[in-house]
Amino acid sequence: MKSKLLRRAAATVLSAVVLGVSASSNLPSGISTKAAPDEYHDDWLHVNENAEVVDMNGNPVWMTGCNWFGYNAGRQVFDGVWSKNMHSMLNQIADHGFNLLRVPMSTQIILQWKNHGPDTGGGVGEVTMMVNPYENPELTVGGGVDGAGQYELKYSFDIWNMAVDWCRENGMKIMIDIHSATTAAMGHQKPLWYDDNFSEDDWLEALSWFAEYYKDDDTIIAIDLKNEPHGKPEEGTFAKWDDSHDKNNWKYAAERGAMACLEQNPNLLIMIEGIECYPDFEKGADWTTPCVDYAHYDEPSLVFGAWWGGNLRGVKDNPVDIGKFKSQIVYSPHDYGPLVWKQKWFYMDDPSKTFDRQSLLDDYWYDTWAYLVEEKQYPLLMGEWGGFIDAEHDPTGENKHWMQELRDYMIDKRIHHTFWCFNENSGDTGGLVYDDFGKWDEDKYAFVKEALWQTDSGMFIGLDHQTPLGQAGNGISLSDYYNGTVTPPVSRETSTTTYSTTTLTTSNTVTESTASSVVSTTSTPVISSTSSESSPEISEGLIGDANLDKKITVADAVAILQHLGNKDKYGLKEQGIKNADVYNPGDGVTAKDAYAIQLFDANQITELPYTE
């Protein structure tokens, strides 16, 4: 906890030093001294009305990462740390261009950390801490192995926080996923988010604590609530998706899990996976209909099957509802190839047929998950995809064929993804490395590299605004990309209106003069027709929009403070200066305006300009 508090303090001080503005000077009594976004708070991501994941400035981003497991499987650390240096491996992942690391965990290990429990598992789960102290002296209490061959490992939570710090220094973000309730190598085979050892309330407690602990560190930008909810009705225990409050209703549980996180940190992205089976209600099926009906085996199924966690058909009629936090939802299916299972859409038993993108869309992808991005309802992050592509494991080449179809589709649709996996010890897929985590599979990496976010010149783009991705000099920061020589995507035009007052609304519908209504539950500035005689004349623009990006966010507060700190370098444009004068209009631009905008963005005041 000491490290966490020091990071918070350092971040607050740094923001004032960098901007050259006192964090508390000349503040009115009614204005909070909440700091503008600093290096620990400027990388949070959100979803806009076009179903794009964007940064604080509204710029679209592309999360392209990989998985590295171990914490879920009982090692109390990443797999491979038993043979190689953890810091070095994290550097390698970032240097290879992965800007997001998905880390499978368990409810058990998070509650252990919360309660300062021992690294032995307490008799529950499969827990054996596996760290090579010779390769990882920094993970030992004494800095290595002594002359007598003795050493003491640091506590696993302290080691985890070292990993978080090393990801931060690499400009690489983290998403954890609750892979299972109980720590176990095969824990993911349990279908639900609770089991005999850990209840749903335990799961919610773990999510809440983790979100609160890291709320001031934007290295961890997302939480995947539960890995692969699944199960078939005929198996007795299964995940469903409807509008009920049934204990096995994943949609309802996901709403509770999301709120457990967002009530602690409203800036987290929440990844929500699907289920396995969804009834064909139009044909009379329900949640008691067997997914595999052996009594009618040769007849068309009345249940739509999918990969575990991959079935998002239920979102169409019953989307996850978390009110004003809708802007933090990203749906996250998983998809695999025929080497994991010979699904019917691969036509592996019919030599006269094969699959392609269109057949995959028609037979499986579109109605199962792709409609969400095709129809721009929600962004998608493919949380797991991958497999063997070498001739020994994939002699027909059909697994690589599937991987290429999915990879290219994700590139075309800018679907976010985390490749499965870095580990070499994933039995049915292999990994990006081999030789006991010592060498990279260059053929597989070259295949995946095509789907990593990079510039035309091959520079990998990170998700951190200040720190370039990796240590190898082949990565850039988000600010480098959007403020440098690289041409960003063309921004969409929005309407501008002459006005005198901006008011906060939580309405779900915003109507623009240039477009049809779009759905959003984020707080949205709308224009009031009420005039204010005390306000100065303002030309076309949006009051509070200091950086002229046509919206009001904490980025405007940052722009004001930078303007005050160094007008030559960060000076606002003339219209931006007019828009920025929101606190007692007519007094000119001061730090008070920045804090008023922060309060407005945090819903602590509901109207701009703000007057006393």
Model-derived features: positions:
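Active-site/binding-pocket entry motifs
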Residues: 69-74, 336-339, 566, 603
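Extracellular glycoside hydrolase catalytic/binding regions
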Residues: 82, 194, 204-221, 226-413
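Substrate-binding cleft of secreted/luminal carbohydrate-active enzymes
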Residues: 356-358, 362-488
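Mature N-terminal, pre-catalytic/accessory segment of carbohydrate-active enzymes
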Residues: 8, 34-37
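Active-site mouth of glycoside hydrolases
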Residues: 38-286, 290, 298, 308, ...
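Histidine-centered active-site/metal-ligand motif
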Residues: 179, 334, 563
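Cellulosome-associated attachment modules in secreted, modular CAZymes
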Residues: 9-10, 20-31, 496-612
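Bacterial N-terminal signal peptides that target proteins for export
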Residues: 2-13
